[in-house]
């Protein structure tokens, strides 16, 4: 690692053909440095990196920096890793594992136990936790542990967000933990999808969606609407740490967040999502019939495990109608069946999106301040309002987003600065603004269910949302 005339050597802990894990030495210069690997006397290319005094990273089960964290319940001699079955209770002491609290006196000797001289804050479900220890672990070089007590006001749930802030301003990645007031296996009353995914098996999931969009291109705002549908038929492994951003959702009243290296335009593209065991063949034909007619969903993949289609758009595209869904009307999703999944049908009712009443004020969002979303006219059948944001920074090769769930009856929700910390700022001079925020509603507690030979469970959801491009500052 080099900065001008100063060069220090990182401390390798693992070296493989395609990966090197190393500890940044405590005497590394702060600021912009170049990193170069030398092997058998041959130096590779230099890559830029930014070194700061403290920047904590929570270690997660999937190794990707999101989802269930490596957090131990300090309850028994075994110190079970927190999971949807081994939950924590409010007031219980937890041990959180990570790296990046800051430098120590010497890197080449066993770590000294003791708090490191940096301000550390832990937030569980948005609530501040009592800190008991924050320093090096005595087990390993470069590994830090933070001992904290679960706040009394922390919400119960299977994917309660956990965030660490150091030095008063540097926010970690967001991990999750499972909390139950009685230490029983966790439940998510507002979201049945997570339990289905954890149970695993042969699953069918359909999403019918209406969205109203506003997009800024070269300073001009374009508005359009779109109706779409998608169905996936897959065998999932499940498990107590299974995590998928689309179904492993935070408790109502909280937010989870994602920040990763790379340009990933949607949550489904994030690395670290559990791999599907098997794609299931549902046959050649899946269709959707409503008041506006019948549309076919195109197959994707081999075997055809995913069926998707743009049903309508106001953009006047050739061969695609202007609208498909009618609020309050039923739509029949039907499949003829195939080698793995038999014939099925499901009836789903369309509904309008909430009215996002302060959308104009969200055209620019200051990440350090957070922002409040207000709405009216949430659909009567919805049990959650979902607020999602995402942004990419191609120049710095980073992506980040957040998702919050709110009570539809509340009419407002404040997305905290902690949830926005890992959303990259919008680069100046972009012709097309790539950041966006969506405000929508759905019924996740009691979705429509359907059955078919070869499926353990099938669910169908109608979601409606308003989405607009946003400049994140």
Positions of PLM-derived features:
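Ser/Thr- and Asn-enriched, surface-exposed coil loops between beta-strands
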Residues: 16-18, 142, 302-303, 350-352, ...
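Exposed regions on extracellular, virion, or secretory-pathway luminal proteins
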Residues: 249-256, 263-295, 300-305, 363, ...
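Active-site/pore-lining binding-face segments in mid-to-C-terminal subdomains
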Residues: 391, 396-428
